UniProtKB/Swiss-Prot annotation:
PANTHER family reported for this sequence: CHLOROPLAST PROTEIN-TRANSPORTING ATPASE, SECA INNER MEMBRANE COMPONENT OF SEC PROTEIN SECRETION SYSTEM
Protein's recorded name: Protein translocase subunit SecA
GO MF annotations, alphabetized: ATP binding; protein-exporting ATPase activity
Taxonomic lineage of the native organism: Bacteria, Bacillati, Cyanobacteriota, Cyanophyceae, Oscillatoriophycideae
Keywords carried by this UniProt record: ATP-binding, Cell inner membrane, Cell membrane, Cytoplasm, Membrane, Nucleotide-binding, Protein transport, Thylakoid, Translocase, Translocation, Transport
Gene3D superfamilies: Helical scaffold and wing domains of SecA, P-loop containing nucleotide triphosphate hydrolases, SecA, preprotein cross-linking domain
SUPFAM superfamilies (UniProt xref): Helical scaffold and wing domains of SecA, P-loop containing nucleoside triphosphate hydrolases, Pre-protein crosslinking domain of SecA
Role: Part of the Sec protein translocase complex. Interacts with the SecYEG preprotein conducting channel. Has a central role in coupling the hydrolysis of ATP to the transfer of proteins into and across the cell membrane, serving as an ATP-driven molecular motor driving the stepwise translocation of polypeptide chains across the membrane. Probably participates in protein translocation into and across both the cytoplasmic and thylakoid membranes in cyanobacterial cells.
HAMAP family listed in its UniProt record: SecA
CDD domains: DEXDc_SecA, SF2_C_secA
Catalysed reactions listed for this entry: ATP + H2O + cellular proteinSide 1 = ADP + phosphate + cellular proteinSide 2
Family membership: Belongs to the SecA family.
Oligomeric form and interacting partners: Monomer and homodimer. Part of the essential Sec protein translocation apparatus which comprises SecA, SecYEG and auxiliary proteins SecDF. Other proteins may also be involved.
Designated gene of the protein: secA
Entry binding sites for ATP: 90, 108-112, 504
Amino acid sequence: MLKALFGDPNTRKIKKLQPIVAEINLLEEDIQHLSDEQLKEKTVEFREMLDKANNDEELEDILEEILPDAFAVVREAAKRVLGMRHFDVQLMGGMVLHQGQIAEMKTGEGKTLVATLPAYLNGLTSRGVHIVTVNDYLARRDAEWMGQVHRFLGLTVGLIQSGMNPEERKKNYACDVTYTTNSELGFDYLRDNMATAMAEVVQRPPNYCIIDEVDSILIDEARTPLIISGQVERPTEKYIKAAEIAKQLEKQESEEDPKDYEVDEKARNVLMTDQGFEKAEQLLGVGDLYDQENPWAHYIFNAIKAKELFTKDVNYIVKNKEVVIVDEFTGRVLAGRRWSDGLHQAIEAKEGVPIQRETQTLATITYQNFFLLYNKLSGMTGTAKTEETELEKVYNLQVTIVPTNRPSQRYDFPDVVYKTEPAKWKAVAAEVEEMHKMGRPILVGTTSVEKSEVISALLQQSNIPHNILNARPENVERESEIVAQAGRKGAVTIATNMAGRGTDIILGGNSDYMARLKIREYLMPQIVMPEDDNLMAGGMGSNNRRPQGFGQDSKKKKWQPSADIFPTDLSPETQNMLKEAVKFAVDQYGQQSLSELEAEEKIAIASENAPTDDPVIEKLREVYKLIRKQYDAFTDKEHDEVVDKGGLHVIATERHESRRIDNQLRGRAGRQGDPGSTKFFLSLEDNLLRIFGGDRVAGLMNAFRVEEDMPIESKMLTRSLEGAQKKVETFYYDTRKQVFEYDEVMNNQRRAIYAERRRVLEGLDLKEQVLQYAEKTMDEIVDAYVNPELPPEEWDVENLVSKVKEFVYLLEDITAKDMEDMTVAEMKIFLHEEVRKAYDIKEDQVDKVRPGLMREAERFFILQQIDTLWREHLQSMDALRESIGLRGYGQKDPLIEYKQEGYEMFLEMMIDIRRNVVYSLFQFQPQGQPQAV
């Protein structure tokens, strides 16, 4: 109705962008005539304009003003360097990103290229732009590939990879544009906020961020907290005692028969009754399970959970006197993984095996809150419209659908549903065989490794050659190799959970990728440094971070792609040229002298058109063009054949919990106006149907006496499936929303404490801050012992004075007599003066040992207290959150209670930090100084 009245809001947004696109297109001709130097000069001009801004608002205005010119410059640079020209729709995508929105662009519409536009524009401010991808490999690929555009135009480009040291990280974060992964960014932020000196801090303040595959990071991983933890000592006897008590407590089966605790299977939680609390307190001989000095509640709750909700040989097994978790989804043993919050220890106590140490959270943040730290946040994805409400409510991000460059020619067949899973797999295999005979490329999507092996076995029986893609990290590079070939005639690819986003399936095969692989095969063994022998022997070591987790002879396997990947053998002339180019590279750089990253970068630059003054790259580029030309002759011909046959056929073997992920799989077919088709094969035994309403459908099938291998296709069924998916999505959304609301409380506290910490790190002279701490502490002591409502003779000045001396031994000479005729305000002023004098004396004593030592001590003690008390506070907040749920029974809103109590706890922590710092500094006795008598 509203759409009919006002038109589609998305269409209106796109309409607004069209005049700017027209302006950029008009500029194109002038900019084409500029020399490379003149084009680079543009960056200097833009920066001079931006330097005139006096505040952030003016800066944004200037960015808006130069946008058409800047985008036109990037388009021209990309044309010269990469041989790629931004389409009009890509310019629109760039504008959407610059506005701090999410651009929904279909697969194959060149999202990676779109990011260069807003990254360049915002990179001009020198405040830093972060481009975030889901894994190290994609970050590296984009930094090498798209980074050339920025480098050509004079911006600096950084790359963060796991395993880099702090110096490298700092250098890369200081660049104008930095490519990285979400986890590296988050952990660097947490580590920066544990640094003890400014020199250790690697990141700059978060400015602008572009997230690739934004839905998977902001939604699928939003609930995942990033945690840095350390080990703590906990009394093991408490776990053992709690396990004994849990054995004596009884489970309540019904309201009529009250017992000690109830079990909520669905929420996997236990609730103790009043009777249970009394019984536990009696057995322990304590007055209150929640006593701050001697808390027992956490241990008892965990012991009951261990008894009721965790079953041996189902949730865990006991092996070599250790409790090992079993993954409920795959049934695999998760060695080395432990349940948190003392639960693992409770299960160890229940099983009577040695109790291992608990870990304590030192710093934590969720992705939701981390990305909200940026001044401007934007993202790209092929599928975000389904999650639009969540993105808008939580992140204040709007979704704009950017039109495709060419209309889609994909056909989606209706779903077919079988009665049993085996019948479904048989039908899938038959469909693959039929399409394979026609010569169409086929992509089969499965939801687990195990299922991909089922279908693989069926295809082997029919002698159909195929490739399997699993989400194992060692397959990442091989994955791109397979995906690059998945569009060849008759190719069959089985992929699990849509692994391998990032490389497009090009019909007829990806000749660019094949040509690069060919060069890699010859160049890498000659030019890359061999790994450390001892690391290679174990097959792991630093090697587990490599894209391929091969063992000892990994290099041979690594640079040698599978033989059938190349469409044709190279002509002898080309082969000789390739060998000569490799020999030239070895002569120039030295035998096995480059790191793998450096060598990859050389190949990446050689396969683009970026200007270069490296003679090796020039030689490699000549060879690349020749190889590519030979391969193109085959892939172009094959492309046309595949298009005639109907393009890529995608077979999905299960509906995913989220419609978005189904759409991603469908989006693999029919990219950039190519033809393609998709079809979902389902069975009543699939998870989604089984959990959400499969019985009804099964009843129907039995009533109609449907044969095992007869599919049913019905609109009603498709609708009920979508309904089930919506239910699941809402369920997960509610969970995320709740996590977010609670975490928001922690987030405000985290911001405050980290801001205070950063002030201390940056402050050169913290003396004034410590003196303020000391004065505040004196005020608090006066307020604690003196009540202005009472007559002065009833004031407890004696104890007040002894308390002051307890904190500051240098005030030994003060007596109650000195203060007896003073008002409260006068007392405070008097103590302020005394404590300042005492501090000067202390400073002289300390600086005698070494000049400037007091300044170092101030910083050290403040940071130490902030870190120690913040760690303890994180635990108290966790405990509060665990127990707060019970408030719901007392007609109170648990969230409001959590906010209030959390705030009070935070204020107490801040007071403790102040007092401890004052006490520690006055007690500080550096070595080499005579002790105070």
